[in-house]
Design a protein with these regions (language model features):
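Loop/turn-rich, solvent-exposed surfaces of beta-rich toroidal or solenoidal domains
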Residues: 293-341
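Repeated scaffold domains used in trafficking and secretory/extracellular systems
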Residues: 146-153, 195-202, 243-255, 296-304, ...
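Extracellular fibronectin type III
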Residues: 72-95
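Extracellular low-complexity, O-glycosylation-prone stalks/linkers
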Residues: 22-42, 66
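Beta-strand-rich domains and repeat architectures in extracellular enzymes and scaffolds
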Residues: 134-171
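Beta-strand-rich modules
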Residues: 54-76
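Sequence/structural signature of beta-propeller modules
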Residues: 92-142, 393-397
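Conserved aromatic anchor
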Residues: 11-23
Length: 397
């Protein structure tokens, strides 16, 4: 095998390696010196596991790792040559940050370039319902520190507000920050099974649906409540219940009126959303396609309110000097009970267009407010960064 990455965390080290077809498993060895005695840390059965975390180590100490693959046949085991020795030092890891990344308080936020330039903030934002995005200064990813999390999706689920993020450097797993729905205070972090860009997320009343690259995955809402009741600073989700491909790439997702809408973001041409019924058989969910809807290029998020109005963020690039730059909010009125003969839902004309700050990633509706999440504060090229989830009263749109 080839070790693709090694990383030190709090009293732990994690390794990633390439999957090797045809082997029976892997052996991982470690030592406190490069030329010292190596101890077997873990024997892994099967070739599909490509990650290992060694815990219980001393803090602020360098450890050395090497590994082999092995094949077992007719009771005999053959072990490969050792990989190159790689090292990592354990480090202290701070708690996940709760405060805003750039603007520490209301006064500083209202002095920001974005607030001064965009009426979406100065005229439409309800500051008391808006809140700082956690984890942008630091996220404790199961004992490893990430300062490069990009916030992507937001949805309301039960008594919680969920915010997803992925590590832009690819060093750590993606996460969901769990916040109290009413107070918007950060509670804990759920660490996801992989590093996929979790660009969208939805809640159907039983399960959390999430993008996994070009697939859709889901896991039970009970994983959220378990993470909260554990009282820990983080919990880990070992695996999704199920994931599968759909008719489109998965960049946009929302749940409304018993329909899970899934769509792709196309940065140069219009695209489609597909509306699916969720069918449960033998305790597993399946998706049955029933609707389509055309969406503009560069659509990043969609949400519906209880009256059937649809809100859509269309956003691309960090500033207006970039090709194809846009950052808008559109409002439409739909009749979801009147698809055409091709089962296409027609949007009609825009009822409202609002110019937004750059990098509007996603939206959700809860109560009488629309919540818009931004990632601009994580990009140095963004001249008008927003480090908040911005609440806008629906009646103002």
């Amino acid at each position: 095998p080839v070790v693709s990455a090694i990383r030190g965390g709090s009293k732990r080290v994690k390794l990633y390696w390439n999957k090797i077809n045809g082997v029976s498993g892997y052996n991982i060895y470690y030592s406190t010196s490069p030329n010292g005695t190596y101890t077997l840390a873990k024997k892994i059965s099967g070739n599909s596991t490509v990650k290992y975390v060694k815990t219980g180590l001393n803090q602020k100490q360098t450890y050395y790792f090497k590994m082999t693959s092995y094949i077992t046949n007719n009771g005999y085991t053959t072990e490969s040559a050792f990989t190159k020795v790689l090292s990592a030092k354990t480090v202290s890891v701070s708690s996940t940050s709760k405060g805003a990344k750039k603007y520490a308080n209301k006064t500083k936020f209202k002095k920001s370039a974005a607030y001064k330039k965009y009426k979406a903030l100065s005229s439409y934002m309800t500051y008391s319902k808006s809140f700082a995005i956690p984890g942008l200064k630091n996220t404790n990813v199961a004992g490893f520190a990430s300062k490069t999390m990009i916030p992507k999706a937001i949805c309301q689920a039960g008594g919680y507000m969920l915010v997803s993020a992925y590590d832009s450097t690819g060093k750590d797993e993606s996460v969901i920050y769990i916040l109290n729905r009413a107070s918007h205070s950060y509670i804990t972090t759920l660490v996801l099974p992989n590093k996929a860009n979790v660009s969208c997320m939805a809640y159907d009343g039983k399960n959390i649906w999430i993008s996994k690259g070009d697939k859709v995955a889901y896991f039970p809402f009970s994983a959220i409540t378990k993470a909260v009741t554990s009282g820990g600073s983080y919990s880990t989700l070992s695996a999704y219940t199920r994931y599968f491909a759909v008719q489109t790439k998965v960049n946009i997702m929302t749940y409304y009126n018993n329909t899970l809408w899934i769509g792709a973001t196309n940065n140069t041409a219009s695209s489609k959303m597909y509306g699916y019924s969720i069918v449960t058989q033998n305790n597993l969910c399946y998706l049955t396609s029933k609707y389509t809807m055309a969406i503009p290029s560069r659509t990043t998020g969609v949400a519906f309110d209880k009256d059937g109005y649809m809100y859509m963020t269309v956003s691309y690039a960090t500033n207006s000097s970039k090709a194809n730059y846009i950052s808008k909010l559109y409002k439409f009125k739909l009749d979801l009970n009147a698809p055409n003969k091709s089962n296409q839902i027609l949007k009609g004309s825009k009822l409202k267009t609002l110019t937004l700050p750059p990098k509007a990633e996603n939206v959700c509706v809860y109560g009488s407010y629309l919540y818009t999440i931004y990632s601009g504060s994580m990009y140095s090229s963004c001249k008008y960064p927003v480090d908040r989830v911005v609440a806008t009263k629906l009646s103002s749109l």
